[in-house]
Amino acid sequence: MISDNVKKGVIRSPNRALLKACGYSDEDMEKPFIGVVNSFTEVVPGHIHLKTLSDVVKHGVYANGGTPFEFNTIGICDGIAMGHEGMKYSLPSREIIADAVESMARAHGFDGLVLIPTCDKIVPGMIMGALRLNIPFIVVTGGPMLPGEFQGKKYELISLFEGVGEYQVGKITEEELRCIEDCACPGAGSCAGLYTANSMACLTEALGLSLPMCATTHAIDAQKVRLAKKSGSKIVNMVKEDLKPTDILTKEAFENAILVDLALGGSTNTTLHIPAIANEIENKFITLDDFDRLSDEVPHIASIKPGGNHYMIDLHNAGGIPAVFNVLKEKIRNTKTVDGRSTLEIAESVKYINYNVIRKVEAPVHETAGLRVLKGNLAPNGCVVKIGAVNPKMHKHEGPAKVYNSEDEAISAILGGEIVKGDVVVIRYEGPSGGPGMREMLSPTSAICGMGLDDSVALITDGRFSGGSRGPCIGHVSPEAAAGGVIAAIENGDIIKIDMIGKEINVDLDESVIKERLSKLGEFEPKIKKGYLSRYSRLVSSADEGAVLK
């Protein structure tokens, strides 16, 4: 065992003394050391219940002959960080979390890990760190939040972001907005739709790293507690079997995750996180081109918020990810999972599917997959749109650019009435390096939706979007403006042509004009000169490469 390097032999007497100071016995030190990686925090609703889950995980570890050691990572709530400088830290926090998991596990000689994340960047961050070690690990995602209810109508967090736009144009009163605010988030869990946190939980299960039904089992459900205990027991077996993550995470496993993502219409942020996770195994193991290639294999089969009217609780009750496997079984690759059964064995074990929620492939929500990769002279390296959440009339759009050099400028313009039907809002210098941190543009997109412009106005950015964004929102434009991408050359009034079905995005300018404009810009001057974001800005790669540190 790896932990023998920490605890075995006369030379490790000082090490054992320190462990005994923590209350561990000689008997405990004979067992596999299991790190229980928690991300409990009192500021994130998706994480406020994780103490309970970690305690239950530890019971499972003990019961099956392991010795658990709990430690914590940070966890940022994207919703609370949204719309201000705090959002610049969200994506970069993924790398801090990965480094923390790697450092703690290696320093203390853990034989295996149980990861307990919930929200957006914490899930991929923990997995990335654990992959660097290539020791057995299993993931227990914290589970979704239930939607709230007010006057017989269901609400969740995105209702509030769009509600701000509705208030601005007089659709609702401030009192009505406050009533929705009081009920939209009724308790623990990740926001109730198929936003980034829940998308990543679903893909973690699809990768084979969580037990079946873990992704969709809700935070307040006793089944989540049972899954946590079973996961604690399971990791001890995995250590004894030496079932490493690289035994599970083959190219085909990543393809399964992408197929599930495309079929469900998950968050566009998955196109950052899945390549970043794969990068820990092999450089460019998975790229944006894989999303593009696989998008032709599956249709969009589930109408879940923000791309429909269903919630995560509906997906769970319809059969969860095993049911999605079953519906897609002609496309799903047969790969290993931490459960011990293969993906197709899990698919065949499904006893019930609600086909009103998880549609059959021959009767999908949309014929095209839920995510789309676009390329053209505006984004030579690609950009991403959640086409499953776009009004079909906006699948093709041509309009004049309204250009803003930050999210703050754009939201002021939108709420100030500067945007009219037909416009293409361009928000730049918000990429991984330029932002820095690649902020989510949820406030601008929600304002556009709330003001009723989402069927006539497109938004393009080198930043990214919340999983809760809907409408013609095209993000991750690569190369970004700070790297001299074409988006930096766009001026007010330039005509932008978008064809989501044809997978194209172009600005109607001659190449010579683009080159001339870019030549006059000079070298990008970083916005932040010190601290973590300054280092991040210098070291981060492009969005099409997963925005990983070089």
From Swiss-Prot:
GO terms for biological process: isoleucine biosynthetic process; L-valine biosynthetic process. Keywords: 2Fe-2S, Amino-acid biosynthesis, Branched-chain amino acid biosynthesis, Iron, Iron-sulfur, Lyase, Magnesium, Metal-binding. Its cofactor is [2Fe-2S] cluster; Mg(2+). GO terms for molecular function: 2 iron, 2 sulfur cluster binding; dihydroxy-acid dehydratase activity; magnesium ion binding. Its EC number is 4.2.1.9. SUPFAM superfamilies: IlvD/EDD N-terminal domain-like (SSF143975), LeuD/IlvD-like (SSF52016). Homodimer. NCBIfam families: ilvD, PRK00911.1. This is Dihydroxy-acid dehydratase. It comes from Methanococcus maripaludis (strain C6 / ATCC BAA-1332).
